[in-house]
């Protein structure tokens, strides 16, 4: 869970009109983005950066203003910039519309943190999802005093992440601190048993089941 920015991804634009395509040809990515937006479904795929956090936040605010119907977020991410994950986590809790998290592929590091922004009963995953929890990491150079400051910030971040995991899973803070000392991988079923996930689902219809 890096505490320094990674390379930003380009913003994804949502067009006002879907492009015309000849019969049988695949739709453009912008058309698919628009359809996903209208279905109140957001995607968090790939590394989490300030650019992707800005994009997700913009969409969450727009969907929240449009309706108080549930918003579904599909998450498949190895993590990334911790503070960008914090942004998504906090905005999900800030808006009025309920959000449902659906893990797929793998949900790791800072992505696990934002995944835990919703109550357990609204946390789902698909059968082959894997989860990773661990302590944040990062590098620092420069004067010894700056390195010491950075080390203290890493310690604070580790404790904050552990408290979030403990709060959302029902585990003790001490147990979580031990679990995240090293990389802890969990299968979908293990994530249910740990308290990260409420249910494993295979179809969208099961979200409201």
Show the residue positions of the predicted features:
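N-terminal organellar transit peptides
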Residues: 1-110, 116-209
